[in-house]
């Protein structure tokens, strides 16, 4: 994330589009919640947003709506592990959090129709009947999954490194 963070901070187009959202208190709270493995919800959303922004820009799609919606797509602000019981949710997190994220996003900025679709449909194909209406909505379904896989990859590499160092320490003894 460090290399990507430098890229993001140096991309004035991206920062001009999402800067106001990044400074929002509610968005900053995403740093307090773990999304996948050791990745915060904030870092995950930032990675998805920037990667989606780049793809949409190259494909001459609506990269502004994409960057903003992708940054807000997981703005649910709770620990989702075991959340259905703990929070008395009517449905599983995978199915309900896009609606919670949209409600929270609407509290902090105006959300256009495309941004709404991007946020609500980002879990497709898990939410099978919520088919993406726009190309941007489909793109986030891919970048979101790739970001999750990237978090998993980093987690496994870190575990392997710890295991290797522990083994190496035993050999040196």
List PLM regions with ranges.
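Metal-dependent phosphohydrolase cores
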Residues: 1-173
